Amino acid sequence: MTAPHLHAVKGGSQEVPFQDASLDIWDKKYRLKTKEGEAVDATLEETYERVARALSEVETTPALKKKWHKKFLWALQHGAIPAGRIISNAGAQEHKPATSTINCTVSGTVADSMDDILKKVYESGLTLKAGCGIGYEFSTLRPKGGYVSGAGAYTSGPMSFMDIYDKMCFTVSSAGGRRGAQMATFDVGHPDVFDFIKAKREDGRLRQFNLSLLITTAFVEAVKADGEWKLAFPVGAGEKDKGTFDADAEDIIWRDWPQKEGYIVNDDGLVACRVTRTVPARRLWDSIMASTYDYAEPGFILIDKVNELNNNWFCENIRATNPCGEQPLPPYGSCLLGSVNLTRFVEKPFTKEAFFNWDSYKETVSIFTRMLDNVVEINGLPLPQQQQEIMNKRRHGMGYLGLGSTLTMMGHKYGSDESLKFTEEVTRELAMTGWRAALDLAKEKGPAPILQQDFTVTQEMLYKRPEMKKDGYKIGDIVKGSVLHAKYSRYMQKVAKQDPALADELAEVGARFTHHSSIAPTGTISLSLANNASNGIEPSFAHHYARNVIREGKKSKEKVDVFSYELLAYRELINQKAMPYSEDEDAKLPEYFITAEDITPKQHVDIQAEAQKWIDSSISKTANVPTEYPFEDFKNIYEYAYDMDLKGCTTFRFNPEVFQGVLVKETDLENTTYQFTLEDGETIEVKGNEEIEYDGETHSAANLFDALKEGYYGKF
């Protein structure tokens, strides 16, 4: 095999050599190889060349192909990093013909029937086989103990069906060599919500899933008011047909529901639900918070906020997200991703003269927007419903990575007033540049088809957007999708305040795509292609730490030693001796070199709130919480996130009794003792960072313990 090779990454006027871990991950995950394992991409430059060529081939004339090949290659060399599926699979059809360039999908609505449950298992199996992550909502399934008339029996409930999807995902990902990713969402008003909260407590159960609750505004307000909360499930339309349904009965409430067919629906589009149980809202809230405090799940999706701010509010009802949560999507929805490496635009880093090159940044974002739009044409999605969705709306999610590293390079502390100002500005410029490109592309290539469609104004539409009534619209009027998108989307109304003329033209012409931005966690592309710049919107976890990575053929995760990009850059450009926590005065880092543990949960939320103003989809972000953080204060983080208009909130508190994280500090490992029982019954205790010989391999004690406990040992 050709030896792996990466050039250095530019850092100011000099270059920062790639670390071994970055080179290794590129070679294992993103470098194109033949089925025999021979490298097709000799260098990273050849990887970028392959991607640029594949995406420029979408253009319609030889002259355009040549022009945009050159520009795409320039953007890739100046901070544009497409998501992993694009880097891996674009231009790779000769070697991987059945793979997709799409990271994010959501299943079609899982209807409450055995036929549809199993149909969706089949569809999701094909989706995972293509390399995509997938999300589902499972609260559409009737609660445990519900009568199934066709079978003359009682259902085992949603959790048991989730087990089927979990086993399918594990089997498909084991066969395909790439671990599958799934998200399960669940309504906070479903009668089985307590079971969902505890679903992963059993070792090894549902480990192919992330879990998130769909938290409604009504529920949060009930918690704040110390009120009651009704758990309910939709009433079948058959009751109305039989004349046994009473809309005014005390046990009937009306709720937004993803599926209308087969249920009783009022004029506002709400579904009749029968209450099965009433609980104190704070009791349910405390149960959610306790689980999140100890187990980091379930996640917290403010679903009413998601739908209120959805650009496609007029034609979608979102109930699920991709596995990492940065893309709330409709049934069969898909979204491709890309991130701009912010560290590439810092000039004169670590000096008083440090500044951000806005012109170069905006040029990269503009070119990258066209590049990502071209990915739609080579999406490789396996299902016709997915193809129709992505071609009709042309969603993509551009975000950034390296925010924490960039702030450090500019001398700002993450969470400070200066950092909040920069976060809003860098996100706003990404958004406005993207929407200007959306208009230019629509004029050149045509808008997203959904925005050319005519829509009939309904009572539900006027209920959601009362300003339409003030503008003279009435039920039955016909209005273009481009108008509903550009004029009445809550997000696009903010764009209009920045640039009224742009919004007016988007309403008239239509945008090339309905959505432009989201911020992904970017774990492996940050580590590899960005030389371990901080993930997504996050600060650096630490400046020198261990990362647990899956290795093909290895029976547990491997602990890899890594350095933050800003530390590498500082050592290369300023002080070669510098190291974190050094007692040597000549080796100490500046005080603005902070990490995730130095940042309060409130500061995490504040940063996310500044970015969310200009991100039209969502943001994957984790607020790190100290192990000893008081539970009552922990609960306040989530209320604060709600008050700050976030679409979701995720926290992580180190708890070695429950799981081993992807990112691990050496001090945490050293301070944690793991107990193993040998075949002869003898018990041994070892520190988490100690190495153990087991089954012919060397493992860190923490990773071996986790693999054995969770049941994935030897199955990667």
Please give the residue ranges for each predicted region.
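Active-site-adjacent structural elements in folded domains
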Residues: I87-A92, W358, P382-K393, T406, ...
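Core structural elements
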Residues: F18-W26, L73-E94, V188-G189, T369-I378, ...
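Acidic/polar, glycine-rich intrinsically disordered N-terminal extensions of enzymes
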Residues: M1-T101, D248-A272, W285-T292, K635, ...
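Catalytic alpha/beta core of large soluble enzyme barrels
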Residues: S22, E326-P328, L372-E377, P447, ...
